[in-house]
């Protein structure tokens, strides 16, 4: 197993599936011509064993072996719960 396990911070955008969440990961990319930094978003499916996440939560996820066709990330911890 590698020493560097990929972890990402993201925001939960869907929790409707059983034991699964969809996490939006934002990154800043420099435009090749104009030089302005633009936000880019990637959505990934992650495994949430206890169904503890809600929409809007900030979470930390890590890469793991493929758990299904689209799921290859798992929840590490909830960094901040969403304000209701």
From Swiss-Prot:
InterPro entries named in the record: NA-bd_OB-fold (IPR012340), Ribosomal_uS17 (IPR000266), Ribosomal_uS17_bact/chlr (IPR019984), Ribosomal_uS17_CS (IPR019979)
GO biological process, one term: translation
Pfam families associated with the record: Ribosomal_S17 (PF00366)
Keywords: Ribonucleoprotein, Ribosomal protein, RNA-binding, rRNA-binding
One of the record's GO molecular function terms: structural constituent of ribosome
GO cellular component, one term: cytosolic small ribosomal subunit
Protein family membership: Belongs to the universal ribosomal protein uS17 family.
Free-text function comment from the UniProt entry: One of the primary rRNA binding proteins, it binds specifically to the 5'-end of 16S ribosomal RNA.
Subunit relationships: Part of the 30S ribosomal subunit.
NCBIfam families per the UniProt record, alphabetical: PRK05610.1, uS17_bact
Designated name of the protein: Small ribosomal subunit protein uS17
Gene it is expressed from: rpsQ
């Amino acid at each position: 197993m590698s020493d560097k396990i990929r972890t990402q911070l993201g925001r939960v955008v869907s929790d409707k599936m059983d034991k699964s969440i969809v996490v939006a990961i934002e990154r800043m990319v420099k435009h090749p011509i104009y030089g302005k930094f633009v936000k880019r978003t990637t959505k990934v499916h992650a495994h949430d064993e206890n169904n503890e996440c809600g929409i809007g939560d900030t979470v930390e996820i890590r890469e793991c072996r493929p758990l299904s066709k689209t799921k290859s990330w798992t929840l590490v911890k909830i960094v901040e719960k969403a304000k209701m």
